[in-house]
């Protein structure tokens, strides 16, 4: 029996697909060369915003046409969990709609009911995963989220935060290292809060807020993992979780890369989003980091057109982008999601105006990114070679940032020292030292 998995959405979904693939292998399946050659075709969907849902539906319908007549088609992931019964009724082409942790090795002929089940039937986080074909790998250290941001529906179908234990994460990290992985990219919905739910459960407490003090489990986890593998990169850091201790740990790890989930710079808009901080506080934190490590790299993401956003809020965001001089940033227009606070708010921003604001901030950030890449010309960097002729320094996260082009004869998976000789937009060109 052969399987094919088509994955949409964020890196967290890609980790889920890896775990599903590992499970299928233990059940006797082998990966197919294509969807057309598979006996089992799986679409791991995304439901974060409307555009992602549309892409997921288009992919499912495309897979239904591509698969062989005897193959079974399964839809899983966020859309399956969020719209299970509705999705099953709308897509007769699908053999099974399965939520997180649902086993589908023995397919039923009709879709299952999902909404009754609040926790997976098995532990998806700790399933085995197949060998990776790259010298880096995502490691998901927690599922779900305890925060309730006004724009985000993820907690409604991913649930509250459930952190993996240090031992479970270490076991996976060591297995990946044995397979040749040289860089771990830690991911979760709220990475900086990793471990707090386990600590609360151990003490029988209902609430603990990181901002009110106490130790931060992620600090020790990062230290331990950094002793096991050369590069440990942290993604999805909620800004209030970026404590002084965590900053020191990230800098000491040798990967001074800060992926901060800021979303806006206007304090008024951040409070409307049910989020912490302000542009001023974010700039203060960035300045502290740059004072300690001038070559630190910053990435963030921002939402344009959240309900109630004004021209003054847009101006604050533009001023912040100019002052922050981030290396990388992603911008998205607001998507009204069922079940969220923002879905029922007044003063919705017209879509065209939101797009206009997005274009304005994107143009500014593109110029900043290009300038910061130009500044790297002449510097010496240490690259991890991802594929023939393509490497990354600590400044580039796999898949989402630029690359460094090098001599294609350098072996994949090796570290090499280079000098940057040219910049081409987001990408760089280098020669071996």
Q: Can you say where each PLM-predicted feature lies in the sequence?
A:
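Proteins enriched for Cys/Gly/acidic motifs involved in redox and nucleic-acid/cofactor modification
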Residues: 1-194, 217, 279-291, 315, ...
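Conserved SAM/AdoMet-binding glycine-rich loop
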Residues: 73-77, 82, 178-312
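Glycine-enriched alpha-helix->loop->beta-strand junction motifs that scaffold or abut catalytic
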Residues: 93, 250-257, 323-327
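Short flexible coil/turn linkers enriched for glycine and charged/polar residues
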Residues: 132-135, 145-146, 264, 296, ...
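Conserved, mostly hydrophobic/aromatic
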Residues: 149, 169, 186, 234, ...
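Short beta-alpha junctions and helix-cap segments that line functional grooves
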Residues: 246-247, 317, 406
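Extended hydrophobic-aromatic, low-complexity segments
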Residues: 258, 270-271, 294-297, 312-314, ...
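Terminal RNA-binding accessory module
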Residues: 333, 344-433
């Amino acid at each position: 029996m052969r399987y094919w998995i088509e994955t949409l959405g964020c890196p967290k979904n890609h980790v889920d697909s890896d775990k599903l693939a590992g499970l299928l292998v233990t059940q006797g399946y082998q990966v197919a060369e294509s969807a057309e050659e598979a006996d089992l075709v799986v679409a791991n969907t995304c439901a974060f915003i409307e555009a992602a849902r549309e892409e997921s539906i288009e992919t499912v319908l495309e897979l239904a046409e591509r698969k062989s007549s005897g193959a079974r088609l399964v839809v899983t992931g966020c859309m399956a969990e969020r719209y299970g019964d509705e999705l099953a009724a709308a897509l007769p082409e699908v053999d099974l709609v399965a939520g997180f942790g649902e086993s589908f090795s023995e397919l039923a002929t009709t879709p299952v009911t999902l909404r009754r089940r609040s926790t997976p039937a098995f532990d998806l986080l700790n399933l085995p995963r197949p060998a990776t074909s790259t010298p880096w790998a995502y490691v998901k250290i927690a599922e779900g989220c305890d925060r309730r941001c006004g724009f985000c529906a993820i907690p409604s179908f991913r649930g509250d935060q459930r952190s993996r234990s240090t031992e479970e994460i270490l076991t996976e990290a060591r297995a990946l290292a044995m397979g040749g992985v040289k860089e771990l990219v830690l991911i979760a919905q709220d990475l900086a809060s990793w471990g707090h739910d386990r600590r609360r459960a151990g003490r029988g407490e209902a609430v603990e807020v990181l901002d009110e003090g106490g130790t931060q489990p992620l600090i020790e986890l990062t230290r331990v993992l950094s002793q096991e593998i050369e590069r440990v990169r942290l993604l999805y850091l909620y800004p209030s979780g970026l404590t002084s201790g965590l900053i020191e740990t990230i800098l000491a790890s040798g990967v001074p890369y800060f992926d901060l989930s800021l979303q806006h710079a206007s304090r008024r808009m951040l409070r409307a989003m049910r989020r912490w901080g302000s542009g001023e506080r974010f700039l203060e934190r960035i300045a502290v980091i740059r004072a300690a490590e001038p070559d630190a790299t910053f990435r963030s993401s921002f939402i344009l057109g959240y309900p109630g956003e004004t021209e003054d809020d847009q101006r604050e965001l533009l001023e912040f982008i100019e002052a922050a001089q981030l290396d990388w940033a992603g911008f998205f227009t607001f998507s009204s999601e069922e079940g969220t606070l923002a879905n029922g708010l007044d003063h919705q921003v017209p879509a065209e105006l939101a797009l206009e604001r997005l274009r304005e901030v994107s143009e500014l950030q593109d110029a900043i990114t290009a300038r910061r890449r130009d500044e790297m010309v002449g510097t010496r960097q240490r690259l991890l070679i991802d594929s023939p002729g393509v490497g990354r320094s600590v400044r580039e996260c796999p898949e989402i940032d630029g690359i460094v082009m090098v001599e294609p004869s350098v072996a994949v998976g090796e570290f090499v020292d280079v000098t940057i000789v040219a910049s081409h937009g987001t990408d760089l060109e280098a020669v071996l030292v």
